[in-house]
Structures are given as C-alpha cells and as structure tokens.
C-alpha cells in the first residue's frame, strides 16, 4: 500500500506541474491576443482619422509605434528580405 500512495502522490505532483505549464501558456497567448486587439484598434482609429483629416492621427501613430518598439510586432512588418 505504501508504494501505491507514493505513486499517487507523484501523479498528483506531475498533474499539478502539467496544469501550471498549460495555464501559463494559455495566459501568455491570451496576453498576445489582447495586445494584437489593441494594435488593431489603433490601426482602425488611424484609418478612420486619415479619412477625416490626415493630421489628427499623429498621437495614435506614436502610440502604435511605441507598442511595436516594445516588441509587440505587428503582422504587417515582414522582414524576410
């Protein structure tokens, strides 16, 4: 019975480690999705303001460039040359 208890404890520890790893990956991907949504909203605002008046979107462009410079790469930046 003692070996069965040890195996059960080991299985619980392994299951807990796997759960932590999986939820960490889910959290990281969720943050990526939120950042991408923020970038998409900024792009939409820039496009809308360009249609109205080209000079009003400078603040949004600065915010977008700050996001991209922080490592949040936008999908339209392709450096495969």
UniProtKB/Swiss-Prot annotation:
Keywords: AIDS, Apoptosis, Host membrane, Host-virus interaction, Inhibition of host innate immune response by virus, Inhibition of host tetherin by virus, Ion channel, Ion transport, Membrane, Phosphoprotein, Transmembrane, Transmembrane helix, Transport, Viral immunoevasion. InterPro entries: Vpu, Vpu_cyt_dom_sf. Residues 50-81 are annotated as: Disordered. Ion channel activity is inhibited by hexamethylene amiloride in vitro. GO terms for biological process: receptor catabolic process; symbiont-mediated suppression of host innate immune response; symbiont-mediated suppression of host type I interferon-mediated signaling pathway; symbiont-mediated-mediated suppression of host tetherin activity; viral release from host cell. The chain crosses the membrane at residues 8-28. Belongs to the HIV-1 VPU protein family. HAMAP family: HIV_VPU. Enhances virion budding by targeting host CD4 and Tetherin/BST2 to proteasome degradation. Degradation of CD4 prevents any unwanted premature interactions between viral Env and its host receptor CD4 in the endoplasmic reticulum. Degradation of antiretroviral protein Tetherin/BST2 is important for virion budding, as BST2 tethers new viral particles to the host cell membrane. Mechanistically, Vpu bridges either CD4 or BST2 to BTRC, a substrate recognition subunit of the Skp1/Cullin/F-box protein E3 ubiquitin ligase, induces their ubiquitination and subsequent proteasomal degradation. This is Protein Vpu. It comes from Human immunodeficiency virus type 1 group M subtype B (isolate CDC-451) (HIV-1). The lineage of its organism: Viruses, Riboviria, Pararnavirae, Artverviricota, Revtraviricetes. The gene is vpu.
């Amino acid at each position: 019975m003692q070996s069965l208890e040890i195996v059960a404890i080991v299985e619980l520890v392994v299951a807990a480690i796997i759960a932590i790893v999986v939820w960490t990956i889910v959290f990281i991907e969720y943050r990526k999705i939120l950042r991408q949504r923020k970038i998409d909203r900024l792009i939409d605002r820039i496009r809308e303001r360009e249609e109205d008046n080209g000079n009003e979107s400078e603040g949004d462009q600065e915010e977008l460039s700050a996001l991209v410079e922080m490592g949040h790469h936008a999908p339209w930046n392709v450096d495969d040359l």
